[in-house]
Amino acid sequence: AHDRRHGIEPSPGTRATGTEPGDYLAVGPDWKGGTPNGIKKVFRSTTPFTLAVVRTQLFNPGDMPNVEKIQSGYKAQPLSAFLKQPAPPAAPKIDFLAANTAGIKDNFFQYLDAALQFVPETPRDKAIRAKLARIGIGPGKTFAFKDLSLEHKAEILVGMKQGDDKVDKWLASGNKDINGWKVGSFFGDEAFFNGDWLMRAGAAKGGLYGNDAAEAMYPYTRTDATGEPLDGSKHKYIITFPPGQLPPVNAFWSVTMYD
Protein backbone atom coordinates (compact mmCIF):
# COMPACT_ATOMS: atom_id res chain seq x y z
CA ALA A 1 0.00 0.00 0.00
CA HIS A 2 1.21 3.50 -0.82
CA ASP A 3 0.09 7.04 -0.18
CA ARG A 4 1.07 10.05 -2.28
CA ARG A 5 4.36 10.36 -0.43
CA HIS A 6 5.81 6.85 0.03
CA GLY A 7 4.95 3.35 1.16
CA ILE A 8 2.76 2.40 4.10
CA GLU A 9 4.58 -0.31 6.03
CA PRO A 10 4.08 -3.09 6.72
CA SER A 11 1.39 -3.82 4.17
CA PRO A 12 -1.00 -6.74 4.72
CA GLY A 13 0.33 -9.93 3.19
CA THR A 14 1.66 -13.40 3.77
CA ARG A 15 4.95 -12.20 5.26
CA ALA A 16 3.67 -9.39 7.48
CA THR A 17 0.18 -10.48 8.53
CA GLY A 18 -0.04 -14.18 7.62
CA THR A 19 -2.58 -16.09 5.55
CA GLU A 20 -5.63 -15.85 7.79
CA PRO A 21 -8.52 -13.74 6.44
CA GLY A 22 -9.01 -10.34 7.99
CA ASP A 23 -10.36 -6.84 7.62
CA TYR A 24 -7.93 -3.93 7.52
CA LEU A 25 -8.59 -0.20 7.60
CA ALA A 26 -6.67 2.47 5.67
CA VAL A 27 -7.16 5.95 7.11
CA GLY A 28 -5.96 9.41 6.15
CA PRO A 29 -3.96 11.90 8.23
CA ASP A 30 -7.12 13.46 9.73
CA TRP A 31 -8.43 10.19 11.19
CA LYS A 32 -8.95 10.57 14.94
CA GLY A 33 -10.78 7.35 15.78
CA GLY A 34 -9.54 4.16 17.36
CA THR A 35 -9.59 0.68 15.89
CA PRO A 36 -13.21 -0.23 15.07
CA ASN A 37 -14.58 -3.59 16.12
CA GLY A 38 -13.76 -6.29 13.59
CA ILE A 39 -10.71 -4.47 12.18
CA LYS A 40 -7.42 -6.35 12.57
CA LYS A 41 -5.13 -3.40 11.96
CA VAL A 42 -5.31 0.28 11.01
CA PHE A 43 -2.88 1.48 8.35
CA ARG A 44 -2.27 5.21 8.52
CA SER A 45 -1.65 7.18 5.35
CA THR A 46 0.08 10.56 5.48
CA THR A 47 -2.11 11.78 2.59
CA PRO A 48 -5.86 11.65 1.84
CA PHE A 49 -5.28 9.30 -1.10
CA THR A 50 -3.84 5.80 -0.95
CA LEU A 51 -3.11 3.15 -3.55
CA ALA A 52 -3.24 -0.60 -2.97
CA VAL A 53 -1.49 -2.99 -5.35
CA VAL A 54 -2.80 -6.52 -4.74
CA ARG A 55 -0.81 -9.61 -5.73
CA THR A 56 -2.06 -13.19 -5.51
CA GLN A 57 0.53 -15.90 -6.13
CA LEU A 58 -0.17 -18.57 -8.75
CA PHE A 59 2.01 -21.65 -8.28
CA ASN A 60 1.06 -23.47 -11.50
CA PRO A 61 -1.83 -23.55 -14.02
CA GLY A 62 -3.72 -26.07 -11.88
CA ASP A 63 -3.64 -23.62 -8.99
CA MET A 64 -5.91 -21.14 -10.79
CA PRO A 65 -9.14 -22.16 -8.96
CA ASN A 66 -7.44 -21.43 -5.64
CA VAL A 67 -6.29 -18.02 -6.89
CA GLU A 68 -9.79 -17.19 -8.12
CA LYS A 69 -11.24 -18.22 -4.77
CA ILE A 70 -8.82 -15.96 -2.93
CA GLN A 71 -9.46 -13.06 -5.30
CA SER A 72 -13.22 -13.39 -4.88
CA GLY A 73 -12.71 -12.70 -1.19
CA TYR A 74 -11.07 -9.31 -1.75
CA LYS A 75 -13.40 -6.40 -1.03
CA ALA A 76 -12.78 -2.67 -0.82
CA GLN A 77 -15.49 -0.68 0.91
CA PRO A 78 -15.98 2.49 2.97
CA LEU A 79 -15.82 2.12 6.73
CA SER A 80 -19.49 3.07 7.00
CA ALA A 81 -20.46 0.11 4.81
CA PHE A 82 -18.26 -2.23 6.87
CA LEU A 83 -19.91 -1.00 10.09
CA LYS A 84 -23.36 -1.06 8.43
CA GLN A 85 -23.85 2.62 9.20
CA PRO A 86 -25.29 5.43 7.05
CA ALA A 87 -22.75 6.81 4.60
CA PRO A 88 -21.27 10.20 5.50
CA PRO A 89 -21.88 13.21 3.22
CA ALA A 90 -20.09 12.89 -0.10
CA ALA A 91 -16.69 14.55 -0.27
CA PRO A 92 -16.50 17.73 -2.37
CA LYS A 93 -15.77 17.08 -6.02
CA ILE A 94 -12.15 17.66 -6.98
CA ASP A 95 -11.37 19.27 -10.31
CA PHE A 96 -8.16 17.39 -11.11
CA LEU A 97 -5.79 18.56 -13.81
CA ALA A 98 -5.73 16.17 -16.77
CA ALA A 99 -2.68 13.97 -16.19
CA ASN A 100 -0.61 13.28 -19.28
CA THR A 101 3.12 13.23 -19.83
CA ALA A 102 3.24 16.16 -22.25
CA GLY A 103 1.07 18.34 -20.03
CA ILE A 104 3.11 17.63 -16.92
CA LYS A 105 6.39 18.24 -18.75
CA ASP A 106 5.24 21.57 -20.18
CA ASN A 107 3.49 22.78 -17.02
CA PHE A 108 5.44 21.04 -14.27
CA PHE A 109 5.05 23.69 -11.59
CA GLN A 110 1.29 23.97 -12.14
CA TYR A 111 1.02 20.23 -11.55
CA LEU A 112 3.34 20.43 -8.54
CA ASP A 113 1.16 23.14 -6.95
CA ALA A 114 -1.94 21.03 -7.60
CA ALA A 115 -0.35 17.83 -6.24
CA LEU A 116 0.98 19.38 -3.04
CA GLN A 117 -2.53 20.28 -1.86
CA PHE A 118 -3.06 16.54 -1.39
CA VAL A 119 0.22 16.02 0.48
CA PRO A 120 -0.19 17.59 3.92
CA GLU A 121 2.99 18.93 5.45
CA THR A 122 4.70 16.81 8.09
CA PRO A 123 7.55 17.84 10.43
CA ARG A 124 10.05 16.20 8.06
CA ASP A 125 8.70 18.30 5.16
CA LYS A 126 8.75 21.63 6.95
CA ALA A 127 12.13 22.93 5.77
CA ILE A 128 11.76 22.03 2.10
CA ARG A 129 8.16 23.28 2.00
CA ALA A 130 9.37 26.63 3.34
CA LYS A 131 11.99 26.83 0.58
CA LEU A 132 9.39 26.07 -2.08
CA ALA A 133 6.98 28.63 -0.63
CA ARG A 134 9.66 31.33 -0.89
CA ILE A 135 9.46 31.11 -4.69
CA GLY A 136 5.70 30.70 -4.78
CA ILE A 137 5.33 26.91 -4.95
CA GLY A 138 2.87 25.07 -2.74
CA PRO A 139 -0.79 24.35 -2.04
CA GLY A 140 -2.99 27.19 -3.24
CA LYS A 141 -0.08 28.93 -4.94
CA THR A 142 0.38 29.60 -8.66
CA PHE A 143 4.02 29.53 -9.64
CA ALA A 144 4.01 30.86 -13.22
CA PHE A 145 7.33 29.92 -14.82
CA LYS A 146 6.41 31.65 -18.09
CA ASP A 147 6.11 35.01 -16.29
CA LEU A 148 9.64 34.93 -14.87
CA SER A 149 12.47 37.01 -16.22
CA LEU A 150 14.93 35.28 -18.52
CA GLU A 151 17.52 35.37 -15.74
CA HIS A 152 15.22 33.67 -13.25
CA LYS A 153 14.05 31.14 -15.82
CA ALA A 154 17.68 30.23 -16.48
CA GLU A 155 18.38 29.85 -12.74
CA ILE A 156 15.38 27.55 -12.28
CA LEU A 157 16.29 25.40 -15.29
CA VAL A 158 19.93 25.12 -14.20
CA GLY A 159 18.79 24.12 -10.71
CA MET A 160 16.47 21.46 -12.12
CA LYS A 161 19.27 20.07 -14.29
CA GLN A 162 21.68 19.99 -11.35
CA GLY A 163 19.07 18.25 -9.22
CA ASP A 164 18.43 15.66 -11.90
CA ASP A 165 22.17 15.02 -12.19
CA LYS A 166 22.39 14.49 -8.42
CA VAL A 167 19.60 11.94 -8.58
CA ASP A 168 21.30 10.07 -11.42
CA LYS A 169 24.59 10.09 -9.50
CA TRP A 170 22.84 8.68 -6.42
CA LEU A 171 21.25 5.94 -8.50
CA ALA A 172 24.63 5.09 -10.01
CA SER A 173 26.68 5.14 -6.82
CA GLY A 174 24.35 5.05 -3.83
CA ASN A 175 23.87 1.28 -3.88
CA LYS A 176 26.10 -1.79 -3.78
CA ASP A 177 27.44 -2.93 -7.16
CA ILE A 178 27.20 -6.70 -7.68
CA ASN A 179 28.26 -7.89 -11.14
CA GLY A 180 27.04 -4.65 -12.67
CA TRP A 181 23.69 -4.71 -10.88
CA LYS A 182 22.90 -1.99 -8.34
CA VAL A 183 21.50 -3.61 -5.22
CA GLY A 184 20.14 -1.75 -2.23
CA SER A 185 17.12 -0.70 -0.23
CA PHE A 186 15.16 1.93 -2.14
CA PHE A 187 11.69 1.97 -0.67
CA GLY A 188 9.92 2.36 2.65
CA ASP A 189 7.71 4.59 4.74
CA GLU A 190 8.30 8.12 6.04
CA ALA A 191 10.52 6.91 8.88
CA PHE A 192 12.66 4.94 6.41
CA PHE A 193 13.42 8.00 4.28
CA ASN A 194 13.68 10.26 7.36
CA GLY A 195 13.74 13.48 5.35
CA ASP A 196 16.38 12.28 2.86
CA TRP A 197 15.04 13.95 -0.26
CA LEU A 198 17.81 12.70 -2.50
CA MET A 199 17.00 9.10 -1.57
CA ARG A 200 13.31 9.73 -2.11
CA ALA A 201 13.94 11.26 -5.52
CA GLY A 202 16.21 8.36 -6.44
CA ALA A 203 13.59 5.83 -5.37
CA ALA A 204 10.92 7.64 -7.40
CA LYS A 205 13.11 7.80 -10.49
CA GLY A 206 14.31 4.22 -10.06
CA GLY A 207 10.77 2.87 -9.82
CA LEU A 208 7.64 4.05 -8.05
CA TYR A 209 5.54 1.95 -5.70
CA GLY A 210 8.20 -0.50 -4.60
CA ASN A 211 8.08 -2.57 -1.42
CA ASP A 212 10.52 -2.26 1.44
CA ALA A 213 13.56 -4.54 1.58
CA ALA A 214 11.89 -7.01 3.94
CA GLU A 215 9.27 -7.65 1.27
CA ALA A 216 11.22 -7.42 -2.00
CA MET A 217 14.56 -6.50 -3.55
CA TYR A 218 14.98 -4.59 -6.80
CA PRO A 219 18.43 -5.00 -8.41
CA TYR A 220 18.66 -2.76 -11.45
CA THR A 221 21.11 -1.82 -14.17
CA ARG A 222 21.37 0.59 -17.06
CA THR A 223 24.44 -1.03 -18.60
CA ASP A 224 25.47 -4.38 -20.04
CA ALA A 225 28.27 -6.64 -18.78
CA THR A 226 30.90 -4.43 -20.46
CA GLY A 227 29.56 -1.24 -18.91
CA GLU A 228 27.94 0.04 -22.10
CA PRO A 229 24.49 1.67 -21.73
CA LEU A 230 21.62 -0.63 -22.64
CA ASP A 231 20.23 0.24 -26.07
CA GLY A 232 17.55 -1.98 -27.56
CA SER A 233 17.73 -0.18 -30.90
CA LYS A 234 21.28 -1.46 -31.43
CA HIS A 235 21.56 -4.72 -29.51
CA LYS A 236 19.76 -7.79 -28.23
CA TYR A 237 20.51 -8.96 -24.72
CA ILE A 238 20.59 -12.29 -22.91
CA ILE A 239 20.54 -12.81 -19.14
CA THR A 240 22.19 -16.10 -18.20
CA PHE A 241 21.82 -17.95 -14.90
CA PRO A 242 24.18 -20.91 -14.36
CA PRO A 243 22.47 -24.26 -13.64
CA GLY A 244 21.02 -24.34 -10.14
CA GLN A 245 21.60 -20.62 -9.58
CA LEU A 246 18.22 -19.05 -10.26
CA PRO A 247 17.44 -16.12 -7.94
CA PRO A 248 16.50 -17.42 -4.45
CA VAL A 249 12.96 -16.30 -3.65
CA ASN A 250 10.00 -17.15 -1.43
CA ALA A 251 7.41 -16.00 -3.97
CA PHE A 252 8.55 -14.95 -7.45
CA TRP A 253 11.17 -13.08 -9.40
CA SER A 254 10.87 -11.23 -12.67
CA VAL A 255 12.88 -9.14 -15.12
CA THR A 256 11.24 -5.91 -16.25
CA MET A 257 12.48 -3.49 -18.91
CA TYR A 258 11.61 0.20 -18.78
CA ASP A 259 11.80 2.68 -21.63
How should each PLM-predicted stretch be described?
Residues 1-259:
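A compositional/structural signature for long, glycine/proline-rich flexible linkers
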